[in-house]
């Protein structure tokens, strides 16, 4: 995977040594994991396992600021539907919320997926996290449907989701 450079960000593959910053910036923060399907990491060793997954995944990116090569969030393909439409998912450190960083990231990833030949991209958010829906809208996506999904991996608890899409 190549790096994707935007106005303020370097979106790059994960690398050895990223786990401490990941844990500090988002995986160890209840405020971030509250709306994600994964549980808050209790220590950096759990994040090391997640880092191994990220490094081996075909499409999982670290979000870093241009001037600091430290992951502040991540974005990846969390699924592909039966028609081959990719679904993106993301998480961003709490200290970076409300600054347009995730919108900038989502726009860049959508452009990359379109460049790779996809004609449509989807994303969803927990209905209790409307700020994530605003990120999708600001990135050019439009609401397409409601759905239901699991609240957390390994849990039977359900949560309502709103799906957004964008076409090439």
Listing of model-derived features with the role each one plays in the protein:
Residues 1-21, 25-30, 34, 60, ...:
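Acyl-donor (CoA/ACP) binding surface of acyl/acetyltransferases
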Residues 31-51:
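Conserved GNAT-fold acetyl-CoA-binding loop/helix
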Residues 51-62:
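A short helix-loop-beta-strand connector motif used in the catalytic cores of GNAT acetyltransferases and
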